[in-house]
Amino acid sequence: MDLRDYIASIPDYPEKGIVFRDISPLMANGDAYREATKQIVDYAKEKRIDMVVGPEARGFIVGCPVAYELGVGFAPVRKKGKLPRETIEVTYDLEYGSDTLTLHKDAITPGQRVLICDDLLATGGTIKATIELVEQLGGIVVGCAFLIELMDLHGRDKIDGYDIVTLMEY
């Protein structure tokens, strides 16, 4: 199965000159969604994962079924003010401005082996911040899994030294 058949490419969205890669068709097709999940699970099995972490919102869509299949928990990374209990936070730069991601202080225990899942690796800012959150709590990031990598944006360079798998490249 070619998962690219289930990615919609929308030109000039959200602004002119950008091609948005929409994973909605993949999620809407049970076979494609299951295949994407299986490929990430197969990657993760040998890593002895204790916890899956995913940044909002599409990291939840990718990470939750992976955690379920691996029989481990899932910890959500959210924007500031969205998690109800005590959190840690990391602020990172965007193209115009900055953003802050948070994680519950008790989401990861020291030494836990963590897989981070998200839909897209673009500039690398979100994944770098997510790694920092996990490591602040003593977690060990043993892998980062993405449905899509946008090669021209070189996000992989920001997380050099981490094991990365992407199912599709554009």
Curated annotation (Swiss-Prot):
Gene3D superfamilies: 3.40.50.2020. It is found in: Cytoplasm. GO terms for molecular function: adenine binding; adenine phosphoribosyltransferase activity; AMP binding. Homodimer. Belongs to the purine/pyrimidine phosphoribosyltransferase family. Its EC number is 2.4.2.7. InterPro entries: Ade_phspho_trans (IPR005764), PRibTrfase_dom (IPR000836), PRTase-like (IPR029057), UPRTase/APRTase (IPR050054). This is Adenine phosphoribosyltransferase. Catalyzes a salvage reaction resulting in the formation of AMP, that is energically less costly than de novo synthesis. PROSITE patterns: PUR_PYR_PR_TRANSFER. Pathway: Purine metabolism; AMP biosynthesis via salvage pathway; AMP from adenine: step 1/1.
